[in-house]
Amino acid sequence: MLKRFNQYDNFIFDFDGTLADTACEVLSCIERAFNKCNVAFDKERLNPSVMGPSLAEIAVIVKPDLTDEQIVNNIVAEYRKIYDYDENDITKLYDGIRDWLLYLKQNNKKIFVATNKPKIPTLRLVKSLNIDFFDDVYMVDKYDDKKLTKQQMIEEIVSKYNLLKEKTIMVGDCLSDIEAAKKAGVLSLVALWGYGADKKALKDKSDFYLEKITND
């Protein structure tokens, strides 16, 4: 299972677009939040290409003339109510992900999550998707008194677990994941099955890239 990476000891994974395909669930909850707030929008603008930015930014992408900050905040709040505890979540792991994670664990590799996703839905999904065996899970709101950037998450994981940077890979699907890895001094592996749109740039800027999970 991706044996060519056996020389590396530590793997830090992004969540949305890397481990799991969350787009359908997220977009459905955004639509429900807009409807709950009685805000009309062009449904054609609500597609997987909007994935990545914060919810507030997505709301404005979906409805460019939405300039009232309070309405944006209301949409975000409604989304959180719907998404955080959705018992009918349709999120699914990408093909081969669980097997890869198990392979890494069985070969004494350390595995982590570093995601801009909030704590409640992240921990809910890690459990419901049956991948709750990470060495640690870092989320944007892991701490109550501060928000973490992706770079800070990586740096703290490296420091807390005494990881060698040259033996550590950040696995993500967006340019921001690659940039965070470089700033934190670790290697980057881009998952081309994710939401990052510019595949050429992702290939050019990352240390490694994967189009699919294989047994080599």
Map each language-model feature to its residues.
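Acidic, Mg2+-coordinating phosphoryl-transfer loop and its flanking beta/alpha structural elements
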Residues: 170-211
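Short acidic capping loops at alpha-helix termini that bridge into adjacent secondary structure
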Residues: 41-45, 70-71, 132-136, 165-169
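Conserved Lys-Pro-Asp/Glu-containing loop-to-beta segment of HAD-superfamily phosphomonoesterases
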Residues: 10, 149-178
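Short, acidic/turn-prone active-site loops that include or flank metal/cofactor-
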Residues: 139-145, 192-197, 214-215
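N-terminal helical cap/lid subdomain that shapes the substrate entry/recognition surface
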Residues: 5-15, 19-98, 103, 107, ...
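Substrate-recognition/cap helix-loop segment adjacent to the acidic, metal-dependent catalytic center
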Residues: 35-37, 57-66, 90, 98, ...
